[in-house]
């Protein structure tokens, strides 16, 4: 016996409504971050090697990412309730310019091992105990940072980058990998990617959107 068309439509509508009600999206920003730093060899004991004015003097109006300079950031995930499945995670990064003109690449990798107070080019932390990176600048593959990049993003102009980080968020949320945040790098020696500073015009612009649903 055939089901009436109206009955089928009602069933489909109820299914769609059920799915939309169960799935939720939260948004975190840099204002929620527990740890953040920009490190580089030009100021090996500083955690804010962001925009060089000249002669080893830096300020925090921009983040100028070059081959030797790295951006570290960690978001807490405790706003995701227990018993969920992460279905989508997108990280938004505000880029203001690239130089020279053309296509550049931004690399995002998971950090390995705890880092914190006093983090800089030489050390992952200086308190409560002084711990050096395995290689300066958190460069140690599989010891300081993941060998494989979580994302490689092509950048050719300013604007918002929308980066799929679903796999990393799922790994951190389930506890399969400890959440130590990301290290963001540029590997081409000729590239400059300038990012808005979370301490200046970019405050609140580093958004992490996570969609999850009950398992």
Give the role of each language-model region.
Residues 21-79, 116, 188-189, 199-215:
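Flexible, small-residue-rich N-terminal segments that precede or flank a structured functional core
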Residues 82-86, 170-180:
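Short glycine/proline/serine/threonine-rich loop/turn segments at secondary-structure transition edges
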Residues 93-95, 186, 212:
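Short beta-strand segments enriched in hydrophobic/aromatic residues
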């Amino acid at each position: 016996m055939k089901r009436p068309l109206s009955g089928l439509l009602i069933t489909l509508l109820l299914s769609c409504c059920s799915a939309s009600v169960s799935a939720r999206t939260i948004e975190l920003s840099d204002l929620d971050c527990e740890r953040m730093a920009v490190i580089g060899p030009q100021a090996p004991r500083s955690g804010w090697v962001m925009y060089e004015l000249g002669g080893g003097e830096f300020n925090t109006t921009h983040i100028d990412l070059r081959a030797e300079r790295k951006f570290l950031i960690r978001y807490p995930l405790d706003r995701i309730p227990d018993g969920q499945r992460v279905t989508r995670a997108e990280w938004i990064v505000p880029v203001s310019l690239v130089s020279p003109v053309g296509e550049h690449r931004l690399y995002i990798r998971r950090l390995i091992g705890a880092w914190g107070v006093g983090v800089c080019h030489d050390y992952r932390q200086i308190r409560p105990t002084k711990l050096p990176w395995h290689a300066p600048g958190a460069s140690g593959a599989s010891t300081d940072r993941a060998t494989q990049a979580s994302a490689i993003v092509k950048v050719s102009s300013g604007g918002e980058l929308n980066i799929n980080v679903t796999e990393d968020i799922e790994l951190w949320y389930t506890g399969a990998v400890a959440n130590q945040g990301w290290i963001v790098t540029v590997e081409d020696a000729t590239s400059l990617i300038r990012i808005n500073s979370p301490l200046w015009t970019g405050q609140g612009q580093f958004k992490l959107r996570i969609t999850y649903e009950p398992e």
